[in-house]
């Protein structure tokens, strides 16, 4: 009987997601890459923490993955470097992240809505749809998405920015999972959201102050979730430091994830279209075809309304909590590594070539930034 309820709930979730995307998304949205062959090697060994047998077998036994598998979740406010992070990890031979699924945060949000409504939650319990049944169904759904939308690998990774708002619940589902929280100066994040016209529920792209307030609320939830999960399970990664010092940061990250070091993570741009696939509708795809460079660090300076600049400390108190100076315009993020400075120079020197590569990976070439001629390194 329990098995039947779990199967019915999984079926409901599948139907819900299919209905959502049929009605809310265009048919040519490439969430899944059908051209890739499956890697049939063994998945990673089970972690130290154990779960009851019926939870371990909630997915097909031949998948090689279960709820104790050491999955990797990358999250953060959109436009905070999550795509760069997943591309660098995708360059590692033992890791596969892939494009945003977009469905995993929605499933987590659906469960959150059920949980918040005492009336709805009680109805589910009375129907025999207990928390355990829901957990098994949602974890099975998440694993099906993670396993099915790309190549198999020893370590599977998911990059959906808003999953980090549910890190505590995800840890309940996947006790051996690791989380990477991408953090970026909120002023840069909001400027990028507005300038690139990234639609996020609740963000008014015509109101910089309101967007800063929304950023502050979102990153506060994510930081609190990360800290609740604990430093052994969740690592905060600052976008600025990843760009300025990629080797030091990636060594820190690979050690945290317990995967061997590989220099390929420093040269992800060489694997685009090979081991790394990009979605032509994601707003960052045209940027991550390029090597790690400094161009995006201070593009926001001079774009913020003066009244918002004056009130920044009160508008976005999380800036100071995260270590940013809300009164610094421009800020001093630090001096870049020599390799990063050279790669930035190459991006400028060969701007036309990188521009051609960028327009090939998007469905709207008009949104791709034109090549930069002036060297911005000296401004940092």
UniProtKB/Swiss-Prot annotation:
Q: Which residues lie on this side of the membrane: Lumenal?
A: 28-380
Q: Which reaction does it catalyse?
A: L-tyrosyl-[protein] + 3'-phosphoadenylyl sulfate = O-sulfo-L-tyrosine-[protein] + adenosine 3',5'-bisphosphate + H(+)
Where along this sequence does the record place binding of 3'-phosphoadenylyl sulfate?
79-83, 184, 192, 196, 239, 284-293, 299
* Listed InterPro entries: P-loop_NTPase, TPST-like
Places the protein is found: Golgi apparatus membrane
Which family does this protein fall into?
Belongs to the protein sulfotransferase family.
Name of the protein in question: Protein-tyrosine sulfotransferase A
